[in-house]
């Protein structure tokens, strides 16, 4: 789960949303939403299309806390049904697509996974005539190394990793990744159940490059992770929410947007960006090569 980090793409589905580059009649979607542009949102009505969307958990506005229910508004506007399911790691998403166990029309992989999926022919090239809101993406996030010219993906969210801790259980605010190895928190530390992020944290902590140049570097970082293991209460992904919000652990590591959510639910929690730095990642919307509804999927994007 990577909830609401930094939003890169604002969908046209917003309250009284207007795209200033266009002039057209306003479509009233429901009591909360209207759309005014010349994009033909209704061209698939009556065609009984279902889009299978596979996203990180709680990674789109869903109507909670008085927010807009984007999926519901999209369905009302377009007549397209959305079958929305979630995953908690790039690797589990990749494995499911690779195995052919399910067919998806929109997926949200992270930057490094995008490069892998492109290389393996797992994504369709996008037709940007069907994605006019791409013009709203900041130039800094266009034409990335992992997807030159954004041929296959639209950047969706930006996030970092950091330390979340319970201020009633941690006397001094942590400042370093090394605090996740502090023996005073033995049995109260939550670590990523995600090899890529866990490796990066141990590399930062030990002063190594997160992109190793030798097997010796890898071995040294792995030693750090092995040394930490006796101190760890649990290796987690989404499980961190219940544990940190419920006061079951003192300190852990997770994504920036999710930390905000946890802090909202438990004001005793706080989040810090470690002094050694952190990993910055971009999650992207893409269409699997097996999708049979590319144009409708591009409409959703």
Describe the predicted segments one by one.
Residues 25-116:
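Early extracytoplasmic/lumenal segment of secretory-pathway proteins
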């Amino acid at each position: 789960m990577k909830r609401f980090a930094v939003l890169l793409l604002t969908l046209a589905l917003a309250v009284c949303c207007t795209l200033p580059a266009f002039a057209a009649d306003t479509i009233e979607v429901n009591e909360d939403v209207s759309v005014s542009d010349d994009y033909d949102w209704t061209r698939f009505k009556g065609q009984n299309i279902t889009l299978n969307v596979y996203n990180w958990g709680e990674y789109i506005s869903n109507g909670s806390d008085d927010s807009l229910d984007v999926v519901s508004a999209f369905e009302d506007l377009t007549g397209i049904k959305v079958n929305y399911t979630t995953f908690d790691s790039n690797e589990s998403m990749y494995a499911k697509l690779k195995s052919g166990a399910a067919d998806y029309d929109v997926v949200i992989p992270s930057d490094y996974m995008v490069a892998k999926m492109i290389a393996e022919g797992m994504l369709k090239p996008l037709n940007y005539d069907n994605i006019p809101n791409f013009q709203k993406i900041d130039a800094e996030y266009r034409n990335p190394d992992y997807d030159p010219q954004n041929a296959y993906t639209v950047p969706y969210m930006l996030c970092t990793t950091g330390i979340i801790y319970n201020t009633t259980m941690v006397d001094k605010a942590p400042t370093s990744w090394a605090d996740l190895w502090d023996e005073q928190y033995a049995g109260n530390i939550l670590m990523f159940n995600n090899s890529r992020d866990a490796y990066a944290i141990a590399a930062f902590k030990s002063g190594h490059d997160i992109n190793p140049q030798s097997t010796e570097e890898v071995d040294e970082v792995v030693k750090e992770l092995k040394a930490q293991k006796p101190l760890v209460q649990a290796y987690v992904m989404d499980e961190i929410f219940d544990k940190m919000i419920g006061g079951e652990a003192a300190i852990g590591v997770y994504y920036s947007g999710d930390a905000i959510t946890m802090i909202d639910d438990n004001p005793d929690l706080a989040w810090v960006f470690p002094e050694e730095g952190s990993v910055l990642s971009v999650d992207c919307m893409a269409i699997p090569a097996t999708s049979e509804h590319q144009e409708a999927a591009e409409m959703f994007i």
